Every structure is written in structure tokens, then in C-alpha cells.
Amino acid sequence: MIEAAMLWNEPNNKSHWDPALDPDWQRFAEHVVRAGDAIHAINPAVTRVLGGMSPIDPHWLGKMEGHGALDAVDVVAVHGFPLDWNLWPLSAWPDKIAEITAVTDKPVWVTEVGVSSFGAEEVQVFGLERTASLLKGVAPRVFWYSLFDLPMSWGAETRHREAEGSSYYRHFYLGLIREDGTPKPALETYAQHAADIGLMQWFHFHDPRLDEAVAWMKRLGTRRIRTGLSWADSFRPNAVDWFDRQMEALADFDVTVTFCFTPEHLGVAPHHTSPARDPQQFADFCAWMIDRYAPAGATSTGIAAPETPPVPPRVPELTPLDFNRDERLAAERSAA
């Protein structure tokens, strides 16, 4: 069951939204306002979440408030990885949330928090236990990132790769389960908190791990999951069949679904981090998904897929199961 719709992922991170194309985030705010209003019109019971900011930045949130975006959401979300990338200590989590509540009275959800096992798996165990003690009772929703390690061959969704240096490889060790399917020590630690802390697991297009993930989450006692439905992926052949399968598999959980990734042919620039030329097209996609998977009544009202210009012959960019890593790195360098 979908309980919440999250509008974009880390919009103040250039890996997910291009500030060169929208330096004041005015366009992003318009995406949020239109999508938030569209979702509310379909089902007012769905909680609308402003995409998890990373870094946690009250000044950016103030900018969103000035653009009117906070009027179209019910919750503000934050992401943090203080033991891996952030320049603040793990113990500062309550302070970081307080920085946001000083700007808005809306609830603050932590929709991604994690600790990699890159250096040592014992560090992940400590980090999970300490994070749980800091955030339980402070944030109404907390989602641990993630259940599975990201396969090395898929590459990480980042435009900071060269700046990250060896820290780039931390992206591939954030799961509670190794790439080979074996559990890490932190999995047992997570199980002790599964009733209160959800999991964030993005399922890529036709992700072969979906059924395994569902089995693990039920075994662990996980109640909530955050995942995503990619706007860009919606233009792939038979995309709706995959979306249906994914949402049916997750029907027994309380789902926060993230809508993001601009289709290349609809962006100001041909990249998934680009603002859409017409933000209403993003809103139409969100409305279509909510009507299909979380209608206000017992059944969908039958909103059809949004009408958009035909997709060019080129396959959409987000193909993590088969992309060429050298090509991606070259693209990152040219866009830097």
C-alpha cells in the first residue's frame, strides 16, 4: 500500500538535479507544486514528501519555501551518511533535524540513512545501532539504505565520482546483504529495529532481486519500504508491466514511492537530472501513478498514461543493468 509519494530524490545534489540548468531551483519548485497538487487531487490521503535533501541544508529549504514548494507537500525529507560522506559526526543527527524544524513546522522524515561496510563490517553494525538510538522517536519515518549491496558492475548514480576518489566505492557496500546474497553482521542488528525503521531499496528496471527482497523483508519483520518509480523508465517498452509487478510485490508493506528522473527527450537538456521543459508533464506522470496504485476509492479512475512527444529511438539513459561504465564516466567528465 502506498502511504506516501516523494517528489524527487536529493534535488540539491547535482547527481540528481542539475543546478547549472536551474541555479535558483525555481523550476524544481514548480515541479513540486504541480506534482503535489496533482497527487492531492487524486488522493488527498497520500502523504506528499519533498524529496530528501542531501546535504541537509536549511538555506536550501528556505529557498523552497520562498518558491512556494512547501505549500504543496506535507513532509520534508532529509538524507545523511555521516560515517561515509557528510562533514558532521554521527552524534549530530538530532541537531541536523533541528536545523530543518527551525525553518518549517512540517514533519521531518529521514528517507535515507546508512553506513557502508567498505572499511569494516563492524563499523556498519555500530553505525546502525547508534543511528537507531539517535533517530527512533525523533523522526516519524526512518529508512535504512539499503537491503542489498549495489552490484559493482551497475555503477553508482553520481556525478561526483572523480571528486570522491576512493570514497566512490563506498556506494557498493551500503547493503545489509552482500552482492553474493550472503548476510552481513548488520542484518541481525537491523532485524531488532525492523518494526520501527524501514528500508530504502531502489529496484532497477526488471531488477532480478525483487522477489528475494520481499522474502527478506517479510522474514525480518520490515513494515515500511521506500522505493521508486522512474519517470524516465516509464517510456521503456512494457514499462507498466514492470511497474505493476513491482507494486504488486510490495503490496503488503507501507510504501513511500519516489517519483524522479527526467526522460531525456522531455528535459531542458537530454539528461535525467535536467528540469523538464514542461513541469506539468512530471505532474501528469505522478497523477497517473497514484491513480493506478493508490486511488482514493477502491479502484482506479482510469487515468490514461500522459500524452507526450514520441520517444526518440535511443534507449533512455538509465539502464543500470547494461550500461557501459566507461561511457558513463566520459559523460560525467563532459558535464562537470
Where are the regions a protein language model picked out?
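Active-site cleft segment of glycoside hydrolase catalytic domains centered on the general acid/base Glu
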Residues: M1-V73, H79-I97, V103, S117-R130, ...
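Extracellular serine-dependent O-acyl
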Residues: A4-A5, V108-T111, K136-S153, T301
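Hydrophobic faces of well-ordered beta-strands that scaffold small-molecule active sites
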Residues: A5, R48-L50, V76-V78, V108-T111, ...
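Structural motif corresponding to the early beta-alpha repeats
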Residues: L7-W8, G228-W231, W242-A276
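Short, solvent-exposed turn/loop segments enriched in Gly/Ser/Thr/Pro and often Arg
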Residues: S54, F143-P151, F203, F259-P263
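Aromatic-rich peripheral "rim/lid" segments of glycoside hydrolase catalytic domains that contact
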Residues: A120, V138, F143-G198, P208, ...
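Catalytic domains of carbohydrate-active enzymes, especially glycoside hydrolases
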Residues: R209-A232, D254-T256
